[in-house]
Amino acid sequence: MKFFAFSMLIGEASPIVLALRRTTLEVRQLDPIIRSELEQGSSSSCPKAILIFARGSTEIGNMGVSAGPAVASALEAYGADQIWVQGVGGPYTADLPSNFLPGGTSQSAINEAVRLFNEANTKCPSTPIVAGGYSQGTAVMAGAIPKLDAVRARVVGTVLFGYTQNQQNNKGIKDYPQEDLQVYCEVGDLVCDGTLIITVSHFLYLEEAAGPAPEFLKSKIGA
């Protein structure tokens, strides 16, 4: 990734700004931006499934305001008490400079995601885990999942939106079954092509996050 053009001539009425505002407004109707059910939940009341999600760069909370809340809201069709939603926060600050690091994010962010996956396995060893990430959050998941060893088999489905390591990782995640992974790359989203050039397409994943992606995860979780 050699380029970064997020700030290039973005005016108040630019397509990128308008897309961001529209996405933010729509998603605010769906779900909170901070979710910590895994960390707060009790092993005596494990849910049907656990979702761990990593937000995109500069997004607030630990879920962000776009893809993460949309996926979580759709999965709650099982029942709000049947899904634990956990955002990757703490050491993962979703800062812009970390996009330039090897692997597209910081090691501390990856380690935090690994910690959460391991906590899910320890707290609810019979509960399937699903995962997701948007923008830099996709790099967090791509870095964390290969480090899970035995726990990796418990991650039954993963969805990635605007995968910043898409080209570098050959559209996959190392040591993770391709059939358990769904990558969403909008036409014109250049981060999926191995660059850090940000176009308006990078902000257009709400439809996938609210529909096809959670449906894929549901197919992996089961009825």
Swiss-Prot record:
The keyword rRNA-binding does not apply. It is found in: Secreted. InterPro entries: AB_hydrolase_fold, Cutinase/axe, CUTINASE_1, CUTINASE_2, Cutinase_monf. Transmembrane segments: none annotated. GO terms for molecular function: cutinase activity. The record marks S57, Q136 as: Transition state stabilizer. Pfam families: Cutinase. This is Cutinase.
